[in-house]
Amino acid sequence: AYANGAEGIAVTYLAKEILSEQGYRTELLNADIAPIFTSLARGKTDVFMDSWMPVTHADYFQKYDGKLEILGQIYDSARIGLVVPEYVPIHTIEELGAHTRRFSGEIVGIDAGTGIMKCTEKAIPEYGLDYRLMISSGPAMTALLKKAIDKKEWIVVTGWTPHWMFDRFRLRVLEDSRNVYGEAEQIHSIARKGFSKEHPFAAALLGNIHLSDTEISSLMRAIEETSGTETRAVRQWMDGHRDLVDSWIPEKEEYSR
């Protein structure tokens, strides 16, 4: 399963193609974060490659304690927060309060129920902001961001790293003095309880996937630049990073499918 985050789409299609090379048949399910965790906990879905810890998805791990498995750590230094274009002359979340009109009193969000949306719902009263949080999606958010930047308009969005938009645009993450959005997080691959026992080779392979800043940025950029052809973009990326991909594949004789 995967949600609409750019990094989640990227690593999910990457995992799918690597598993396909190893002879596995996979089915992708696109859904919001909350239904994904519910489906994993009920054993209806096998794997989710974009779980953020220890803050963003902590509520789901607490709710479904004992029903999920952590396979591995994909990325080491993920962040969430509020983001503005660099030409907007503010640097902190507090400063949003003095410029409500310039931002039309709106923070452009993504899918409802995601960790970053929950944090933003807390940040608005915490910082005393008179803003409404707009529910949309990752692709819709970046489309509105691009439209505003093209016109040099003021806009504030919910943003996170890793994301290709930081390569495409000159952006600034607003300082969060009250630490509503937490510190740096890690992105994990997780599974339903029992998956590792039933599919030890696949679980080990997925758990081995780990990407640096440069690697995940290049993967996301390849997908974003070839919208609608994720499979082809991922295969091309794999061809250019074959040694890395091969390093993730366990010795088959150590596992029985």
Where do the model's predicted regions map?
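A conserved helix-loop-strand patch within extracytoplasmic ligand-binding domains
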Residues: 66-113
